[in-house]
Amino acid sequence: MQFSLVMSYYCLACFLVMFALGRAIKAHTSKLPPEGVGTIRLQSDPLSLHMAKLYEKYSREGSRLQDGNTVRSFRAQPDSQFGSPLYRFNLSSLQQTEEVLAATLHFAPVKGSRSSRDSYCKRSKKSSCRLLLPTQHQKISLVFKSVIQNKTLGSEKWNTTNIFHKRAAWHVKDITNIIKDAQHERDLFISMEISFGEKFATVFENNPSELPYILVFADDRAISDPNSIALTLQRYDPFQPNGGNSKQAPNTFPESRVKRDTSDLASSHDNELPDIKYMRYSKEDLWESTYKSLKHKSPRKEKKKKGQENEETLPKSPVLHFDERTMKKARRRQWDEPRVCSRRYLKVDFADIGWSEWIISPKSFDAYYCSGACEFPMAKVVRPSNHATIQSIVKAVGIIPGVPEPCCTPDMMNSLSVLFLDEGRNMVLKVYPNMSVESCSCR
């Protein structure tokens, strides 16, 4: 008897310990971010999670996707001012340059839509009543209307009835033709009513996790245009004083900026960097060209180089003054870099350029850049074009003055997927081309 009593207490204690441990584990895991979206800091509602998965897919597959380069999301806004519950969508951010490829409506089964027959048969035990029960599918009608000036409810535009599975967590409806018509007719404010058979939904969902949303997959024809990323992501002029909003075009700057010398402007037109007057070095002093590496330098030039390291022989800078130790480190760092045209590392943080407030992901990316000389003879590794080869020969011969060396420029580039909020706080996913340098060449 005592043994059985002890075993009973022991089993009860084990049960309580396991129960407490299970609750502790559940409480801990509930605080963890969803898998795969912790790095982009999204909310846990279905729309945010859906866009997070699309971002991961587009980042993984890049330009190989057949779904275009743009995904726009539109969350429904509940509205009951027109008598019956409905949802409004503001599609005004959809651009004319974005060719709609596909559009889907996502909505949850509305609660309280069960008919009186369903409730009666659930309480009844008659087999005849159960035979009259509907199947696991449900007829749902979607009525779309235009909204004039975002206030007056317009005429009915689209009416579609479909059969959905009752046990589905979320329903998905293809509304590509509806969105295409709305874009073509510029009816970018639309409303939607959901009805079950002849009865409209009586439960009005205002919970963000239950609100319907629309995803539009489009191909933006203007995304490859010059300065396209600034047109979509730059919200203010970075050169504007005090960071205020600017009404100028993204590629213009205030008139109050410091004007450069005309000689600098002339040098920028011929692909040459402006001369640094306070620290002039000849090409032979900074670098040994590849075809002169085995040639012994004369003592005169060596003496000249040693003299350059003397602080007294360095001309004074009109802007900045550095001690000799700092200058030696800078020159040593410059000499350590590869002489030939090549890809150099550059990491861009969107916070540094003031875009982090609306860019969700990525927070930063490896952009790289191209730098280096394209002198004759050019190595095969820089993949020079025929024109660049001829230009380098003409430059080396020197028979035509003013001809610059070929430029070190990106040859192959990769795209970058960016998930951000537009000015209407809608989540947008775009795949911008030519965002990261993969290789460089002389052109």
UniProtKB/Swiss-Prot annotation:
GO cellular component: extracellular space
Signal peptide residue numbers: 1-22
Record's keyword terms, sorted: Cleavage on pair of basic residues, Cytokine, Developmental protein, Differentiation, Disulfide bond, Glycoprotein, Growth factor, Morphogen, Secreted, Signal
Basic and acidic residues biased stretches: 256-270
Classification via InterPro entries: BMP3/BMP3B, Cystine-knot_cytokine, TGF-b_C, TGF-beta-rel, TGFb_CS
Homology family: Belongs to the TGF-beta family.
Protein name: Growth/differentiation factor 10
UniProt organism field: Xenopus laevis
Organism taxonomic ancestry: Eukaryota, Metazoa, Chordata, Craniata, Vertebrata
